[in-house]
Amino acid sequence: MLPLPSELQIQAQSIKQRFSELPAPPDLRDEDIAVLALSDFVSDMLLIHPQWLEELHQQPPQPQEWQYYSQWLSQALAGVQDEAALLTALRLFRRRVMVRIAWSQVLQTSGTAETLQQLSTLAESMIIAARDWLYQVCCRELGTPCNRQGVPQPLLILGMGKLGGGELNFSSDIDLIFAYPENGQTQGGRRELDNAQFFTRLGQRLIKALDQHTIDGFVYRVDMRLRPFGDSGPLVLSFAALEDYYQEQGRDWERYAMVKARLMGGADDPYSQELRQMLRPFVFRRYIDFSVIQSLRNMKGMIAREVRRRGLKDNIKLGAGGIREIEFITQVFQLIRGGREPRLQERALLPTLQAVAELGLLPEQQVADLSGSYLFLRRLENLLQAIADEQTQTLPNDPLNQARLAWGMGYADWAAMSTALENHMQAVRVVFDDLIGDETPDIGEDPSHGLYKSLWQDVLEESDLAPLTPHLEEAARRQLLATISGFRHDVDKRTIGPRGREVLDQLMPRLFAEVCSRPDANVALSRLILLLLSIVTRTTYLELLVEYHAALKHVIRLCSASPMVASQLARYPLLLDELLDPQSLYQPLAPSAYRDELRQYLLRVPEDDEEQQLEALRQFKQAQQLRIAAGDITEALPVMKVSDHLTYLAEAIIDAVIQQAWNQMVARYGQPSHLQQSEGRGFAVIGYGKLGGWELGYSSDLDLVFLLDCPLDVMTDGDRSIDGRQFYLRLAQRIMHLFSTRTSSGILYEVDARLRPSGEAGMLVSTIEAFADYQRNEAWTWEHQALVRARIVYGSPKLHQQFDAIRQQILCRHREDPQLQQEVREMREKMRNHLGSKQRDIFDIKADAGGITDIEFIAQYLVLRYAASEPRLTRWSDNVRIFESMAHYDIMSPEEAAALTRAYVTMRDEIHHLALQEQSSKVAADSFIAEREQVAASWHKWLAANDANVS
């Protein structure tokens, strides 16, 4: 054993003092002191439970003792009579065994592979013991779940990730998926329950038993987000539902996750075998699948962006050459060739690497390097986490914890340990780059950039600039020199360090080479400098622009085209990561993919870290809006598609925000008890205005109205039970809070809930009955106009159907046309007086006569006027399809409908482009003359005061 360094000797003296104050002070051996000095967790536990130290002396930890964990746990649970006692027993058992594992790990009586086995077996034993105990309790309370033949149905649990691979780290969450074989009902209970309801309740109680924090701590943080549909999906699925999902909707990343999936309990019963056989074809393809490399490259890019986003430094899991890259290297071979090579279907990493060597897929020396680096990094990770039983992979920067890790790894000091770590991670990085690394090569030093070095490093005269910018006028050259000089002066006032200065000196000649040849060089450079000033002290982003020349070109192109994009990049430099893949940059996601992409994005953030979740939502929105704007700028997306994408993006975010708010509320109060017998959550959100009409712009707010479906006498089923309707009110308030909270990435959306019944004076959440009553008996005509553009954007199927029926019923009312005309016209005049430009030389595209609002009012008037005789006119909430319907049902001529649509789309397109230029919707008075004449003619035809009824 190495002698303890000075930092640990000081720690040892403190520990001796604390143990000497116990009622029966133990005799501490040298090895005891070494372990206690390395781990606050172990010393804290042994001070609380000094008898465990005596047990360590009498029965020292053995490498293979994991084989007895289940037996020991059965003894610990033998006297447990209720759930509270179960929670206590599980937590004490976990602490006791984790102390033994940490002890064995520090003293190296167990190797790293054996430690990983111990940690994984402990978790599996506790999951299975808790499941089996709770299954019996649930069967007594609810009846036994059976299939249609009366055969009892079990709960099967897939352990994912490191748990599935038998490689769990010291302080880890556990990723689980719950499944049951067949649908059916419970038998023997007071009343029948569907199997889905039984297993959902069992699953909820199991998660609580493992995850809930009590005075004794917790057992494991349980993460269920890898299940089909993530948080928004059922907690437990039948085999048939699982199979349908993975066959029809399984994503690449779910396939990779399933490589390590393992049934907990090692069961070989027919149901377990059936589930394994069902999943195997999804994971391992029969053909050689080289698409894996690009998919894994994309995943690695996502992780690299995550490292930058969270400012992670010295991260031995996610950093270059870290644990994750070794896992990716191994998975490449498993996923490409695993379908044909059974030896590659191992869940554990080290045996898979051995198979890679035996199959000649990598040189033996590289496999040896990877295996050695993996064991080194995993031991370091476990020692790091054992210090305080905390889930971290970031190396410490304080001397005490550095000394702990250096000694635990067998090095004299931190410097020696750091050198060894760097060598291991570099060896991994070499293999990773060869196999998976980025396709974009560094461009090297372009000789032409030498011409521009003097422009950055020397003080040039205007005449010196002429050869570099022959196309610019003298005034433009003077402006360019002044801009560069000002930027240089600003940089000199910043503390950027020698590395930052070196990278900036590489970047600026490259940037000038691209910018100076442009006709809009001054505009481009002034916008780029705003970005550069925001990142000049963040070397990571400067390096990104140096290393990826394509990214630099995209930055210049987008900033030149749009000050909105330039200011977004300057405010949120994380968005620069989006420029690395031009294919995705100019090609936004498929509209149906936003929900799944956001789900993947949020999976990388701890579920219980609200601040990180809020940041991630905002960053996802900004990244996707950048991609949409890039498609808009390059005209890859027409105006209608821009709004469609912005609307689908908003809906995905609404879904995720409600999910987060729901989880937080249920954790605090439980869920309303009536949901146990119903489908969905008894909650819905109506989108009004631009959201309802599929017309969102880049800075649009969201007009939302909240509905609930909850009987009066319902309470929530949590420990802090509250009235069910109060629960939904607080849920809506929480949703509003999550949208509006300002983080370092800004707010998510401005949300306006004033279109609810009775406006600001009304309840934030309405029952569906109250909403219907208000619309029938109290709503003004303008509120019925708003209803034309309303649709459900989130909600249970029942509420969705009820709202659609109410909306159609209200819109299909018979209305007296002269009165309807007058009320629509008066509301329009009121808006025009309030919002119009009132300047002769200005035309406000939105608010002035002949503009977009007139077109919207014409569409709304026509629906309210004619839906009574043709209910199908209420189907759509967007103007374009409303006009199509008017032509289809012979209410409006096809020529007029097409002309109004053209006018509407043309003006909407201009508003989008003005937004990209950070300009308002006010333009010169002679703009859109033809379109305004068409709108005015249609307004006069349908809504002018002196017209007779037109039918």
From Swiss-Prot:
Cofactor list: Mg(2+)
UniProt-listed SUPFAM superfamilies: Nucleotidyltransferase, Nucleotidyltransferase substrate binding subunit/domain
Catalytic activity: [glutamine synthetase]-O(4)-(5'-adenylyl)-L-tyrosine + phosphate = [glutamine synthetase]-L-tyrosine + ADP; [glutamine synthetase]-L-tyrosine + ATP = [glutamine synthetase]-O(4)-(5'-adenylyl)-L-tyrosine + diphosphate
Keywords on record: ATP-binding, Magnesium, Multifunctional enzyme, Nucleotide-binding, Nucleotidyltransferase, Transferase
Cysteine pairings via disulfide bonds: none
Annotated region described as Adenylyl transferase, given as residue ranges: 449-951
An example Gene Ontology molecular-function term: [glutamate-ammonia-ligase] adenylyltransferase activity
Family annotation (InterPro entries): GlnE (IPR023057), GlnE_rpt_dom (IPR005190), NT_sf (IPR043519), PII_UdlTrfase/GS_AdlTrfase (IPR013546)
Domain of life: Bacteria
Entry GO terms, CC: cytosol
Transferase among keywords: yes
Recorded family membership: Belongs to the GlnE family.
Free-text function comment from the UniProt entry: Involved in the regulation of glutamine synthetase GlnA, a key enzyme in the process to assimilate ammonia. When cellular nitrogen levels are high, the C-terminal adenylyl transferase (AT) inactivates GlnA by covalent transfer of an adenylyl group from ATP to specific tyrosine residue of GlnA, thus reducing its activity. Conversely, when nitrogen levels are low, the N-terminal adenylyl removase (AR) activates GlnA by removing the adenylyl group by phosphorolysis, increasing its activity.
Protein name: Bifunctional glutamine synthetase adenylyltransferase/adenylyl-removing enzyme
Gene that this polypeptide is encoded by: glnE
